[in-house]
């Protein structure tokens, strides 16, 4: 039944009951304290009223005594100063009595009887006060007979009657307050005893409920935790009820089932780990062997790369020398091309000069022809002249012979010049062909020079590339050696991992997963082959 009630609800009800009991107890205490305070205030007020009324009566008696002394001194004809002093004292006492009585009247009256008594006291005070005022006035005006016949004693007696009534009333109030305080004490004691009994019953019930609903279930939960700590995961956990403890049992059962599944998975995982570790060991051995083979191959490759680097370096040197020779040949060819070009220009100038000489010879030939014609004309004219012209005819014949010889010489020179011009033209053509050939040679040599430069650059780049490849091969060799070291370290780590797996298997072997089961777990011992080094 109690298992179906939530602990929070029960604790809430317990707190509510505690609150009700506390509020009830505090309420009773407050009621008693308030009633006592009211009684105390009433007693205090009664005492203040008694004190104020007693002081008023005492001051009134002082005033009456002073007036009586003043009347006696007046009748005995004492000095006026003494009488005046007594009168001043009497007047001051009367004024003070008025103030004191007003404070008495300002105090709240209780019931109707007290208010009536207060009014009667006020009347008797006013009467007594007026009689004393009259006595003072008569005494100051030397009406001694009126002073002596004033009914002061009667008014004083009336006030004293009211004063005594007030004393009785105040005593009655004090007695009533005392009796009420006694009753309140008895009621408080009864309530206190009742509260103690109820609290004892309540605390006993709460302790029984706490032990039944919290302590005992928590002890059971603790025993389950001890069983789980001891490795017993097969102990059944009963879940009943619907309160928070039930939720803890349900969570504990869920935790037990989860632990059972976890331990089972760990067992399976440790076995699979052993298998995987064995495969890793085999793979490490294989990898170690291949790494060593790769290291040997890389060493051979590094040696070959060194030889290739030396050969390529020699080729690069030869290519640089060939490039220098090609540069020199290109320079020489360019110089020859310049000289051939100069020769071509000179042959062209010679051809031009020969043509000019031919033109001059043609002019000379024309002149000789004209001279021959003129000589012929002169001979004709000399023949006509007869003997006078015979000498002129001889001269004309000589001139004609000279003209003929000049024309013949001019023809021969012209033939020679034409032959020379033809040969010069042929030489110029040959020089032009030689110049074109030299240009082709210079262009070819320049291309050869460029190609040799490119070959030299390529050889240098190839040498640098081969050096980088050799360096990379050397680094690969170092990395391979490091990999071999890592493989050895991995083998050691694998062996340690196998030991840890064995330790893990031995640790989870203490758990009992099923009831009446004795957990036995055979560790798989891995035969780790040594890594080939």
Curated annotation (Swiss-Prot):
Segments on the Cytoplasmic side according to the record's topology features: 1-6, 210-533
Gene3D superfamilies for this protein: Aspartate receptor, ligand-binding domain, Methyl-accepting chemotaxis protein
Bilayer-spanning residue ranges: 7-33, 189-209
Positions where Glutamate methyl ester (Glu) occurs in the chain: 489
SMART domains documented for this protein: HAMP (SM00304), MA (SM00283), TarH (SM00319)
Keyword Cell inner membrane: yes
Signal peptide region: none
Membrane topology recorded in Swiss-Prot or TrEMBL: Multi-pass membrane protein
Periplasmic side: 34-188
GO term, biological process aspect, one: chemotaxis
Residues carrying Glutamate methyl ester (Gln): 293, 300, 307
Domain Methyl-accepting transducer: 269-498
Entry keyword Flavoprotein: no
InterPro entries xref list: 4HB_MCP_dom_sf, Chemotax_Me-accpt_rcpt, Chemotax_Me-accpt_rcpt_Me-site, HAMP_dom, MCP_chemotaxis, MCPsignal_dom, Tar_rcpt_lig-bd
GO molecular function: transmembrane signaling receptor activity
GO CC term, one of those recorded: plasma membrane
Database matches in SUPFAM superfamilies: Aspartate receptor, ligand-binding domain, Methyl-accepting chemotaxis protein (MCP) signaling domain
Keywords associated with the record: Cell inner membrane, Cell membrane, Chemotaxis, Membrane, Methylation, Transducer, Transmembrane, Transmembrane helix
Subcellular locations according to the entry: Cell inner membrane
Pfam family, one: TarH
Limits of the HAMP domain: 212-264
Functional summary from the UniProt entry: Mediates taxis toward dipeptides via an interaction with the periplasmic dipeptide-binding protein.
Xref: PANTHER family: METHYL-ACCEPTING CHEMOTAXIS PROTEIN I-RELATED, PROTEIN ICFG
Family: Belongs to the methyl-accepting chemotaxis (MCP) protein family.
Protein name: Methyl-accepting chemotaxis protein IV
Species per Swiss-Prot/TrEMBL record: Escherichia coli (strain K12)
């Amino acid at each position: 039944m109690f298992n179906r009630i939530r602990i929070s609800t029960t604790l809430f009800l317990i707190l509510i009951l505690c609150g009700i009991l506390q509020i009830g107890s505090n309420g009773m205490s407050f009621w008693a304290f308030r009633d006592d305070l009211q009684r105390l205030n009433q007693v205090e007020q009664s005492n203040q009223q008694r004190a104020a009324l007693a002081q008023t009566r005492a001051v009134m008696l002082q005033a009456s005594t002073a007036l009586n002394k003043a009347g006696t001194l007046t009748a005995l004809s004492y000095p006026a100063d003494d009488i005046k002093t007594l009168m001043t004292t009497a007047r001051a006492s009367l004024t003070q009595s008025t103030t004191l009585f007003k404070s008495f009247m300002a105090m709240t009256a209780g019931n109707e009887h007290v208010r009536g008594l207060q009014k009667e006291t006020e009347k008797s005070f006013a009467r007594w006060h007026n009689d004393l005022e009259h006595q003072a006035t008569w005494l100051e005006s030397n009406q001694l007979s009126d002073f002596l016949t004033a009914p002061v004693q009667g008014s004083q007696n009336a006030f004293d009657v009211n004063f005594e009534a007030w004393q009785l009333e105040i005593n009655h109030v004090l007695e009533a307050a005392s009796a009420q305080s006694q009753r309140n004490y008895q009621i408080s004691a009864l309530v206190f005893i009742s509260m103690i009994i109820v609290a004892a019953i309540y605390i006993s019930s709460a302790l029984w409920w706490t032990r039944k609903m919290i302590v005992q279930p928590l002890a059971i939960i603790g025993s389950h935790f001890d069983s789980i700590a001891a490795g017993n995961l097969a102990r059944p956990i009963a879940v009943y009820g619907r309160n928070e403890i039930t939720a803890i049992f349900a969570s504990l059962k869920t935790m037990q089932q989860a632990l059972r599944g976890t331990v089972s998975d760990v067992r399976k995982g440790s076995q699979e780990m052993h298998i995987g570790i064995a495969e890793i060991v085999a793979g490490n051995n294989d990898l170690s062997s291949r790494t060593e083979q790769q290291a040997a191959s890389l060493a051979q490759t590094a040696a070959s790369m060194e030889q290739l680097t030396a050969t390529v370096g020699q080729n690069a040197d030869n290519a640089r020398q060939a490039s220098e020779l090609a540069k020199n040949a290109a320079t020489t060819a360019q110089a020859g091309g310049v000289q051939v070009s100069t020769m071509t220009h000179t042959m062209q100038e010679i051809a031009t000069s020969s043509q000019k000489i031919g033109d001059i010879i043609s002019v000379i030939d024309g002149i000789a022809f004209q001279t021959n014609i003129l000589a012929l004309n002169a001979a004709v004219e000399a023949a006509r002249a007869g003997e006078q012209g015979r000498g002129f005819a001889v001269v004309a014949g000589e001139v004609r012979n000279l003209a003929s010889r000049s024309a013949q010489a001019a023809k021969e020179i012209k033939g020679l010049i034409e032959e020379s011009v033809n040969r010069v033209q042929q030489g110029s053509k040959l020089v032009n062909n030689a110049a074109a050939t030299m240009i082709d040679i210079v262009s070819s040599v320049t291309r050869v020079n460029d190609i040799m430069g490119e070959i030299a650059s390529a050889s240098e780049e190839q040498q640098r590339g081969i050096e980088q490849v050799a360096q990379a091969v050397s680094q690969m060799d170092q990395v391979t050696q490091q990999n071999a070291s890592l493989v050895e370290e991995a083998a050691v780590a694998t062996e340690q991992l196998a030991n840890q797996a064995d330790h893990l298997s031995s640790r989870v072997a203490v758990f009992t997963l099923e009831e009446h089961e004795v957990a036995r777990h055979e560790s798989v011992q891995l035969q780790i082959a040594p890594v080939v080094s």
